[in-house]
Amino acid sequence: MPCPWPAPAPPCATLREALAQGQTSGTLAARDIAPGALRSLQPRTGAAKEAAAAPGQLHALITGQPLFAGDTRLPGLLYGRVLRAPVSAEITSRPRAWDAAAARADPACVAVVQHPRLAQMGSLGLGIVARTPSALDRIEAALAVQWQVDDGSAFEQAAIDERIDIDTHLRRGALQHRLRKDDLPTDTAWTLDLRMDVPLAAHAPIEPRSATAHWLADADKKGIALKVWAGTQDLFYMRDVLARQFSLAAERIEVQACRIGGGFGGRTLCTVELEAAVLAQAVGAPVKVQWSRAQEFSQGFQRPPSSHRVRARVHGGRITHWWHALASSHILFTPAVMPVWMQTLADLAGDSGVARGAQMPYDVPQQRIEFTAQRLPVHTGPWRGLGAGPNTLVVESAMDECARHAGADPLDWRLQHTTDARLAQVLRRAAADARWPERPASDATTLRGRGIVGGIYKGVSYAAAVADVEVQRTTGQVRVTALWCAHDCGLVLQPDGVRAQTEGNLVWSLGMVLHEQLPVARSGVAAASFADYPLPRMGDVPPLHVHLIDSNEPPTGAGETAMVAGAGAIANALRDATGVRFSRLPVRSADVLQALSTRA
């Protein structure tokens, strides 16, 4: 995400240089280091890769000690909530009328707070503060807020689908941005013409976000004025936003970063932290704001939906021409981080988050890859891997279809189209671990299939996955029975941590293909609980086999790499089992039954 503040590069670089030279104590003075001298961590010869210690908070986690923002306790702590109109934050809305007397009649009510800083994009909220968290629901009901909403911005799911429909955009001509623009003959005889659509999706962290704010009396106006406890992915950004909002020097705000119960890009903006700070200032006491599950769905930002069309020509046993066009919404250049005038300028450059993963990792001589990003009335932003998950799923689905047209083995087809030794290595490793030639056989009751995918994340980290699936002929129920993943992120400093990240990516991939779709209705997100947004459960998760490639290359990151492999492997296995390429996600039992019936 673009950072509007100067990054503390010299101190970080100075510290890393000192550590690399063996200095582990004492005082360092930050010094300027030329950008050209900065480099990634270089592995030392003979480094003990498996000697990493267990995470320092492991014992505290398994014994339930207070580590998360919601665990914060302070003397005199009060509890707050900011009420908002039940529509998207992209729509202008504000409280029009409320019954303050009825709310204050509750003995647990401390205050009803109106303040312009309670605005999140177009949504202006109304704050309430109570003595106990259980009283907040009661006070909210008594307040009976009536909302003023911009009627001209009403929308339903169909409006979102129409705005990003890739075929509509292609009929209008070339898309906004091109990642690769080789000339493709207008009379190209396409072997494959594939349309795929990926829906809106939520972060759905197990821990809804929380923050506690405490304003401190400071007579000399130089010390810490505001302390905030939060589960944030960027405490410096949080501090700087609060400093701007309250016209304070950044040095007068202290943000204590607590452990996060699920971030995935969703804890980057200043939301609940600002709400807590405004309410705490209004009542002159520390205030904790804890979002509900419904607020997490409706007020957090989501992975944008995307619509894709891929055309490919297969000739002489190879792909000779490739055209991938996609339409989506913004991930980095959103209203949450920049004003409207800046969004317009940013649109000229193109949102790199939308494009991530759209460039295929294989060798095809003639390619056109283009995209457009449309402003949507739903709140979109970074989701694990940004655009890499949906984009690579589509690329690898098309790659698999091309292999079928050529009558080629999917593994051999991929190896035939790459000269990248590291990509070939993870493909071969995943295939070997899964015993690729030993394909699962279908029987009278169950269809079985196997799929493989390889990918490169941000040009530096590699992953390949193999998936096995079973499909019940009579019910259409799909079960992933095994997932293998080979992962190359250079030198692995914390093997257990990398395995855990890879396993998490694979579970997200499972949800992406078979479970997750955020419903939209009445101008906003319609999910209030996990009943409305099903996630993979423990019983849905197959055995996960992760192989970390032993490498002495510099470490390149592992938090999102396997997102380029897991979903495509599952989708390709489903295609192998059923003979049907499902073009709209998620794939549910009813979709499978209908497809099998049509095919029969």
Region spans (language model):
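Cofactor-binding beta-sheet edge motifs in enzyme active sites
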Residues: 1-600
